[in-house]
Each structure stands twice: as structure tokens, then as C-alpha cells.
Design a protein with these regions (language model features):
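Phosphate-group recognition and catalysis centered on beta-loop-alpha active-site segments
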Residues: 1-252
Length: 252
């Protein structure tokens, strides 16, 4: 593994700017680059199979308007996910790439239990990080599997921003990253016109034992700027370019 100045390159949807997103080609691309982490999204089929897909339907990737949750795996397996092959099942990806780590966005509540079952069956809890914009979804996951590693929930991200930038602690806020296995805060560099990732934010996150991962960063100058701020990870659609810009990747 080559060095990247301590900044991990995380392939967003498997590097959606360099391979068809969330496909076997994308997963293979991540592995061929020698990356440690792939970011992906999960949906569940009508018969409970966990599928790599950002969207709830297949219109954008397979020109099929049907929802993933409406289709059985048999029906899904007959479709082209964008690279001439069927959609990727999480269980198959975990088995086929035993050294690859997956940063998983739980796109719907229905997928939580099924995803946990798949990850447990593959004995892969140590190489999966769960994320979600839904605080409730993360809470359910943590209750069902206390050993699961997650990123910080949205409410706690706000609490961290206020604490870092203004020294404020929200009344009644539970600092969930001090309980359980929360290892990273994953945020955009800015929310609208408001900067999120600042030197104070990065420093506070590090004091709290959290890595800082920034999404979705595709411009070389922005990659360099964030790396200079000592962020720990850059989530990008162009991982090959990011490796070139940052000089490789540090093993994690």
C-alpha cells in the first residue's frame, strides 16, 4: 500500500466517476487501485436480499422504473446494473473481496436488520462502517448490534460543529460518540455557503477520537486543501485521480 500523507481515499459508490456506480466493475476498480475503503449504499429486495444501490429504483442505472423492494433477487439478477452484469449483492461482495472495507449508507429502515445479518454471516463486522442520515436508523442498528461501527449521526454532527466553533454544548445532547463504536464524522466541506470543515472542527473531532471524512470531493485543489487541514479521509467519485493528487493511500 502506498502512502497518502495520512489521508485515506474512500471510493464513493466505488468511484462513480471512473466506473458504473455500485457495480461489480466499480468494486473491482476499488480493489485494483489498492484502496482500503469503498463507500456504498444498501437497499433490500422483495425477498430480503441486500443490494448495492443508491436509488430506490433502477431507472437511472438500468432504465427500469421498478423499485428494488418490489423485485425478487431472481428478477433483479436478470437486469443489467450498468456494466453488463446484475446488481451486486452485499453478501457476494463481502465474500469476493475479503480484504476490502465497506462504508455502508443504510438508505432505508427496512435494510438494517437484513444488512446486519449479512455482515454477521460473513464475519465482517470489523471491516464495515455503517452510516445514515437517519439518527433513528443508526440508533436501531446500535441496539441490534452494539459491536457495529458507525459514523456520527446528523444531530451529533451539529453538536460537534457548535462545540468546535462556539464552545457550545446543546442542552440535553448525548455525546453518542463516547458510547459504542463511533469512529468517524462524515460531512461535506460546506453546507450551502456555511463552512463545516474548519481547522477548529477537525481539531475538536480529533480530540474526541473521531476521524474526519469529507464528501464528495472531486476537484484536485479541494483535495489538497482538505489534506493540508489534516482530514483523515476524502470520499470521492474519482479515486484514481485522488491517489495521484495525494500521492497514494495510507493503510488503515
Amino acid at each position: 500500500m502506498v502512502a497518502a500523507r495520512g489521508c485515506t481515499v474512500i471510493a464513493h459508490r466505488g468511484g462513480a466517476g471512473e466506473a458504473p456506480e455500485n457495480t461489480w466493475t466499480a468494486v473491482e476498480h476499488v480493489a485494483e487501485l489498492g484502496l482500503t475503503w469503498m463507500e456504498t449504499d444498501l437497499r433490500v429486495s422483495a425477498d430480503g436480499l441486500v443490494i448495492l444501490s443508491h436509488d430506490p429504483d433502477l431507472m437511472r442505472t438500468a432504465a427500469d422504473p421498478r423499485g428494488i423492494g418490489e423485485l425478487t433477487w431472481k428478477e433483479l439478477s436478470e437486469l443489467d446494473a450498468g456494466d453488463g452484469r446484475p446488481p451486486v449483492r452485499l453478501d457476494d461482495a463481502l465474500v469476493a473481496f475479503p480484504r476490502l472495507r465497506f462504508n455502508i449508507d443504510l438508505k432505508e429502515s427496512a435494510v438494517v436488520q437484513d444488512a446486519l445479518q449479512v455482515v454477521r454471516a460473513a464475519d465482517a463486522l470489523e471491516r464495515v462502517r455503517f452510516a445514515s442520515f437517519s439518527a433513528r436508523r443508526l440508533a436501531v442498528l446500535r441496539r441490534q448490534e452494539p459491536r457495529a461501527t458507525t459514523s456520527l449521526g446528523v444531530g451529533d454532527v451539529l453538536a460537534l460543529v457548535l462545540h468546535a466553533e462556539a464552545g457550545l454544548r446543546l442542552p440535553g445532547t448525548r455525546w453518542s460518540w463516547t458510547k459504542g463504536r463511533v469512529d468517524a464524522v462524515q460531512v461535506p466541506a460546506c453546507w450551502g455557503r456555511v463552512p463545516v470543515v474548519t481547522e477548529r472542527f477537525v481539531a475538536q473531532a480529533h480530540r474526541d477520537g473521531l476521524e474526519v471524512h469529507v464528501w464528495t470531493v472531486d476537484e484536485p485543489e479541494e483535495m489538497r486543501r482538505l489534506a493540508a487541514m489534516r482530514v483523515d479521509g476524502i470520499v470521492t467519485d474519482v479515486p484514481a485521480l485522488a491517489l495521484e493528487v495525494l500521492g497514494g493511500q495510507e493503510p488503515r
